């Protein structure tokens, strides 16, 4: 209500770093979490895709295990902090989707990884214009190779990690939205009661009251 924009910083940093808090190894947490907490690193959460949206089970991005590396291919979009983040928590399939009888894909076989801006094969494909306090971008991965040490948790745990992360921060985003709405209503009422025109207050006009 008083500073809804504070939640944007909390939620964006939290979304990007929570997978590390929940499932990252000790070395991974030690490398990134203190920097995020101190405001010295920006995190991003890369889950949504152009064709799948927020339907996580339908994601098409893949990560193929190749010796001591994973090779990522695919796209992510509407990624908050895209283009300015110091690291990205990226979700991709490490095994093909299993089809249910109704034809839908199961969420099994999804894994999570840390990707850094300088990784070869990783590019910011598009900067998305939007009315937002943070940048949005489409990310592209073309044979992007990252060390196996950048796997968050174990293979196949990505869906659970993503849902546990969203369980935390969807709540705070919803609370911020409610706070914005309450503040907007209160500001509108205050203005209507104090704005004079044509010899009356704005609140006294029938159109305002209706």
Residue locations for each model-derived region?
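A structural signal for short hydrophobic beta-strand segments in well-ordered beta-sheet cores
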Residues: 61-64
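Internal helix-loop-helix
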Residues: 1-30, 34-40, 81-87
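A short, Trp-centered hydrophobic/proline-enriched beta-strand micro-motif
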Residues: 39-47
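A short core secondary-structure module
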Residues: 69, 73-123
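Glycine-rich beta->alpha junctions and the first turn(s) of the following alpha-helix
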Residues: 112, 122-210
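Short loop segments at secondary-structure junctions
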Residues: 23-26, 66-68, 93-97, 117-120, ...
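Short beta-strand segments that buttress and anchor functional surface loops
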Residues: 46-49, 91-94, 126
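Active-site-adjacent elements of ketosynthase-type condensing enzymes
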Residues: 51-59, 130
